[in-house]
Amino acid sequence: MIDAILGNIIWMALITIGGVLISWSVHFVPVGGAPAAMAQATGIGTGTVQLAAGAGLTGLVSAGFMMNVTDNLPLILASGSVGAMIMIAVTMIVGSIVYVYGVGVVPSSAKVKVDPITKYRQDLYVSQGTEGHGLPTVSYVSGIIGGGLGGIGGSLVYYSLIEVGMSAGLEAVGVTNSVTGHELVAVAAIFAIGIFFVNAVIPSYNIGGTIEGFHDPKFKKWPKAVVSSLVASIMCAIVAVVAIAQLGGI
């Protein structure tokens, strides 16, 4: 077990970095929860973990697809990032259409008087008794940034786990077509998803309900979540590396 840990210390470090990126990314995603579902709060009307996991897992799938054709890490991370950003962007666009044309409210934030990006007044359009509604531009941009960071984090975790399995007994040296369809893909994906959920849940306790994006006062709490996720990711990395190494890459 000690040999497995020492032999894969670099990949464990990358897994930990990926987990920290995932945790940080959650704070960028505009989460409105149940109030947003009723257009009584700014953000997307679902939970923190669901949104983060949706974007991150889409990025993981994109990264896995890219690994069919190349073992270039920057390209794999870019693919995962873009995949996650597209997913969260489409989610926010559809949500905005429903809020504007279905509910009939103007996307606006109750956290700031002026949108930091468009400089449009927000307080004039916030309905009485609500904490904003819809997805103003600043929340949209923040969500895309969060999706990108989460996609990079998830891709980094998945790539590292694949490499751990490769070094544990598979013939191929890098991540190439020979990995496609192999059982190692399933095992690495399971661990990557697990690590992603762990690091998505921790910030949800830190946020405590809803958050509009990087302009929200709650965003300043991110260092606490990042430190907690750093510790959790180290533990997850140890378990994942030891398990995959003991299985000999399946």
Swiss-Prot record:
EC number: 7.2.1.4
Any single Gene Ontology cellular-component annotation: cytoplasm
Reactions catalysed, as given in the entry: 5-methyl-5,6,7,8-tetrahydromethanopterin + coenzyme M + 2 Na(+)(in) = 5,6,7,8-tetrahydromethanopterin + methyl-coenzyme M + 2 Na(+)(out)
MF term (GO), any: tetrahydromethanopterin S-methyltransferase activity
An individual GO BP term: one-carbon metabolic process
Primary role: Part of a complex that catalyzes the formation of methyl-coenzyme M and tetrahydromethanopterin from coenzyme M and methyl-tetrahydromethanopterin. This is an energy-conserving, sodium-ion translocating step.
Name of the protein described by the UniProt record: Tetrahydromethanopterin S-methyltransferase subunit D
Gene behind this protein: mtrD
